[in-house]
Structure formats: structure tokens, C-alpha cells
């Protein structure tokens, strides 16, 4: 028994962390002409403007963008991280999308573009409001960010 426990403890750093979180929409992220200057990941050493992005529409994968709890605030080292969000509907059908993190959200939450949430929930974002999801961080390149 002790050997089994030690084996799993040894493997735990290699495991991908899957978290239970919630997602809601914020239509601010649907407006392609919105400047990056209104989000936490604008400028600074970890900001997205240093890579030539200027507004939401210039970001790869727009409108699959939003705020993530992992982004602590302005100039976070987690700016530009990519998150796979998986929603399971009432019939047990799951759907996943990848979201580029560009702004701060509360711990355990994501706030994403309405269009992105409609993709995730089969056009039920407004009806559902906030939903439970599982999230896991994936390579930024999955969201089209190759920096």
C-alpha cells in the first residue's frame, strides 16, 4: 500500500491539472475593436502589446478570448495562457473550446466572449448565464499564440 501511494505521489507533478471552474460571458470580449489597453494583459513585460497585438480582433482565435482566474492582474506572467474549457450539458454531452487568457477574473472563474460561450453551450449562454466547466491549461500555441 505504501509503495502504491509513493508511486502516485511521484507521478503527480507529471499529471495535467484539471480544475472545476465556472464560466460566464462578458460582451466586452466580443467587440473586436476594443483596445488591449482595457485589459490586464495590455502592456508591460508580460503584456500582449509587446508582440504587436493592438485590439481584440488582432488576437489569434478572436473571439475565443476572455478573463481567467489564473491571471492575477496587470502584467501577470499568465497573460496569453491558453485554457481548454469543457462543458457537459444536461444530456451528458460534452463540448470543449480553447480560450486565450487576456484579462483578470476571480479565482476559479472565466469570463469569456458571448460568442465563445455560445459555441461552448450550443447557443445557450444567455439562457444558462454561468455554467460549471472543467479547465486545463494547454500550450499557448493551441490558441494560435506563437510567441
Predicted regions and their residues:
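Classical eukaryotic N-terminal signal peptides for Sec-dependent ER targeting/secretion
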Residues: 1-11
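Secreted/periplasmic proteins
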Residues: 12, 16-115, 119-147
